[in-house]
Swiss-Prot record:
Organism listed in the record: Lacticaseibacillus paracasei (strain ATCC 334 / BCRC 17002 / CCUG 31169 / CIP 107868 / KCTC 3260 / NRRL B-441)
Keywords, sorted A to Z: Ribonucleoprotein, Ribosomal protein, RNA-binding, rRNA-binding
Protein name: Small ribosomal subunit protein uS5
Alphabetized InterPro entries for the sequence: Ribosomal_Su5_D2-typ_SF, Ribosomal_uS5, Ribosomal_uS5_bac-type, Ribosomal_uS5_C, Ribosomal_uS5_N, Ribosomal_uS5_N_CS, Ribsml_uS5_D2-typ_fold_subgr
Chain's role: With S4 and S12 plays an important role in translational accuracy.
GO MF, one example: rRNA binding
Taxonomic classification: Bacteria, Bacillati, Bacillota, Bacilli, Lactobacillales
GO biological process: translation
Recorded coiled-coil stretches: none
Protein family: Belongs to the universal ribosomal protein uS5 family.
Length: 167
């Protein structure tokens, strides 16, 4: 399990990915609520996401941002991209994340693009496979990002020196 990342030490930006109106039918009619999905990141290798639900949109957004700050993860970045190719899974959604050459930009759509930009990854290629609802794409992307390892981390896990690893 990763250690806790203190959001107060970071200069975080937030972005609302989606706001969904949810109704519950009760005896007296319909009850309206709102669900918001927010992503926070410092554009320097830290990113988190969460959902917030409330009777008013601003309150749902505030709850989502506050919860996202508590779920930050650290993303290993090599130059301007990720260290290696990875596939993240969540539910019926899959996301393929591939490193890209410097200057190629973020080739990702929708919610995946927001995660990458707030994580500070400038060059990456991605492909969404399976279902593409925003929350499942974000969760699959975060799953993929948590699987990333740097060359030094892999060498330490294998018990060898980083220079002995092949490219």
């Amino acid at each position: 399990m990763a250690s806790f990342i203190d959001p107060n030490q970071l200069d975080l930006e937030d972005q609302v990915v989606s706001i969904n109106r949810v109704t519950k039918v009760v005896k007296g009619g319909r009850r309206l609520r709102f669900a918001a999905i927010a992503i926070v990141g410092d554009k320097n290798g830290h990113v988190g996401f969460a959902t917030g639900k409330a009777q008013e949109v601003p309150e749902a957004i505030r709850k989502a941002v506050d919860a996202a700050k508590k779920s930050l993860i650290e993303v290993p970045i090599v130059g301007t991209t990720i260290p290696h190719e990875v596939i993240g899974h969540f539910g019926a959604g899959e996301v393929l994340l591939k490193p890209a050459e410097e200057g190629s930009g973020v080739a990702a759509g929708g919610a995946i693009r927001s995660v990458m930009e707030l994580a500070g990854i400038a060059d990456i290629t991605s492909k969404s496979l399976g279902r593409n609802t925003p929350i499942n794409m974000i969760r699959a992307t975060m799953d993929g990002l948590t699987q990333l390892r740097t060359r030094e981390q892999v060498a330490e896990l294998r018990g060898v020196s980083a220079s002995s690893l092949e490219d």
